[in-house]
Amino acid sequence: MTIMKKRVRKRLSPVQLIAAGFFILILFGGSLLTLPFFSRSGESTHFIDALFTATSAVCVTGLTTLNTAEHWNSAGQFLIMTLIEIGGLGFMMIPILFFAIAKKKISFSMRIVLKEALNLEEMSGVIKLMIYILKFAVVIQVIGAVALSVVFIPEFGWAKGIWFSIFHAVSSFCNAGFDLLGDSLLADQTNVYLIMVVSALIIAGGLGFIVWRDILSYHRVKKITLHSKVALSVTALLLIGGFILFLITERNGLTLVKGTFTERLANTFFMSVTPRTAGYYSIDYLQMSHAGLILTMFLMYIGGTSGSTAGGLKTTTLGILLIQMHAMFKGKTRAEAFGRTIRQAAVLRALTLFFVTLSLCVVAIMVLSVTETIPKTSGIEYIAFEVFSAFGTVGLTMGLTPDLTLIGKLVIISLMYIGRVGIMTVVFSLLVKANRAEANYKYPEESIMLG
């Protein structure tokens, strides 16, 4: 058995191990959720619905075909929370935790896989970073649970209040969007404190662990990496820019929120936060303006930062594209920012990611427009919203998910998986000779007319 495991590990590349690991975790979680033990009714759950829930949990999305509060009992909800935690932090955290407890040395091959899982340039310090991520995640989620308990314990009592606080702290930090309230934060849209606590947890989880390490260690090293500078800049741009645009398109939530000016302001800010990629909602998206829906879809498509609990195209990818565009407009060929030159390979990768992921979403919209029924009161945005939500692992919905056909469910499952694992990881895992070296010769160059 040990020899067979070693052979499998040798045959699989690091990216294939990551893709396979998430896939196996989803299948395992989905199989468990079919058991009568986890449902309130005591009956078995249909495999596709269980698989959909497991995929949504592991890929920290939040889209569900079954109501989490009504269908699953406490054991089922705990299993979903566990899948969210493992999926959010990365399944490779499990062996790291066991190795740390047992005080055993981690193999070189596992270090390579960890490097790929975190999208790191080099392998030095990868174990220290993983342990740091674990500690940071635990501390933030504990603080979040305590902050949420101020709301949930008075409302639901000690036992249920503590459980709700823990579940929603984990779901918020991991940008999952699963809720036990039945209708997300819609009934609590006037609770500014709750909205701001959830917003803080979402931002903390979506910002990226490497960025947080740079921020928290700045007082010692007085240095922030280019990755963190780009991530922080784009995150601020999207949060502030999104907030201002939602103020305009939704008139500060005048038609969406029944509350005071401050309460509407908090909800407008939340509209900018939650598409990045949490899935909690405090307003009815069916009532949102078309301009607001387009902005929400854009934010869902971009998602969070690389090396975080979020999905989507990623803020750093958008940052590189914007920097390259700025360079082109100034007549330069090199992408430069913060006194550094971005590698050409990174620019090409960003362009590839943008084209491939957007094409994937367009194809998915076309497929679902054939297989699904669009209400007479809605248009193609009804399907497009769900597609971008799934790819960005967001979890916001206009109501399509519960009524998906079998093909529709499989399409959304695939989008959630690709959005979490990464399109490049999925593609490279399917290529047998993905790491084949470039030929040592070069063809003659020739220009092509553009624009």
UniProtKB/Swiss-Prot annotation:
Q: Does the keyword Ion transport apply?
A: yes
Would you tell me the Gene Ontology cellular component terms?
A: plasma membrane
Main localization is membrane
Pfam family, any one: TrkH
Q: Which residues cross the membrane?
A: 18-38, 46-66, 78-98, 133-153, 162-182, 192-212, 230-250, 293-313, 350-370, 380-400, 410-430
Keyword vocabulary terms for this entry? Cell membrane, Ion transport, Membrane, Potassium, Potassium transport, Sodium, Sodium transport, Transmembrane, Transmembrane helix, Transport
Which Gene Ontology terms describe the biological processes this protein takes part in? sodium ion transport
Keyword Metal-binding in the entry? The reply is no
How does gene deletion manifest? Mutants are defective in potassium accumulation at high pH and lack KtrII activity. Disruption does not affect Na(+)-ATPase activity.
What are this entry's molecular-function GO terms?
Answer: potassium:chloride symporter activity
How does this chain sit within the bilayer? Answer: Multi-pass membrane protein
Give its localization: Cell membrane
Protein family: Belongs to the TrkH potassium transport family.
The cross-references to PANTHER family, in alphabetical order and at most eight, read: KTR SYSTEM POTASSIUM UPTAKE PROTEIN B, TRK SYSTEM POTASSIUM UPTAKE PROTEIN TRKG-RELATED
Question: What job does this protein perform?
Answer: Mediates electrogenic transport of potassium as well as sodium. Acts probably as a potassium-sodium cotransporter. Major sodium reentry pathway at high pH values.
Q: Write the protein's name.
A: Potassium/sodium uptake protein NtpJ
What is the species listed in this Swiss-Prot or TrEMBL entry?
A: Enterococcus hirae (strain ATCC 9790 / DSM 20160 / JCM 8729 / LMG 6399 / NBRC 3181 / NCIMB 6459 / NCDO 1258 / NCTC 12367 / WDCM 00089 / R)
This chain is encoded by the gene named: ntpJ
